[in-house]
Amino acid sequence: MDIIKSSFDKRQSVQKNYDLIAEQYSNEFGTYIEDLDVYEKFEQHLVENAKILDLGAGSGRTYSYFNKQNYEYIGLDFSKKMKDCAYNLHGKFPYIVDDMVNVKRYFSNNSLDAVFAVYSLFHLPKNDFNNLFSDVYDILKVNGLFLFTNQIGQGEDMADEPYLNEKGKNSLYMCYHTNEEINDLLHSFPYTELFKKQKIEISP
């Protein structure tokens, strides 16, 4: 019970903080596509009319890319205020407000062509992170695609978030994973790696 309660509290703190900064975040990132080459490479492997789930959809920047194509896009995020920002920017589209750990409440096994999780999974505590890989594997169709980002490191901490500083707070829960941990996790399922990109950011 302690682990579940602890994990819930950490996820809930992230949700509350994103509600606080939703408008500022949306203004800066609502239509901004970083690493466009990754999106394009991912798209090369998508089937026609693919059904895509975006875990941690935020203010809809992934929707702003895939809406231009003939795909069935569904967003999922635990921040109601992020959903409101997404609708203000892009108009209404399928968007579920809930914690991504509950994804199997909404999708049956073998029902999705692709799952997209960019800049979101590193807010999950390690046990939830690992369990999500199992859930995603279940809901993907055979030869389905899973694109995700990871913050390389070890352990967990409360990372500085400038937007929160403006709200009288200053940190956001983060959980890190080494490349070895990710590889072990992928190999514990029959996931096949198609491509990866590693970015190294050097602070001044």
What are the functions of these language-model segments?
Residues 130-142:
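A short glycine-rich, Lys/Arg-flanked "PGG" loop and its adjoining helix->strand segment in the class I
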Residues 1-47, 49-56, 154:
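Conserved class I S-adenosyl-L-methionine
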Residues 59-103:
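Class I SAM-dependent methyltransferase SAM/SAH-binding core
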Residues 106-115:
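A short acidic, Gly/Pro-enriched loop at the edge of an enzyme's catalytic core
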Residues 191-202:
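Conserved S-adenosyl-L-methionine
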Residues 163-180:
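Acceptor-substrate binding/catalytic loop of class I
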Residues 143-150:
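Conserved beta-strand signature within the Rossmann-like core of class I S-adenosyl-L-methionine
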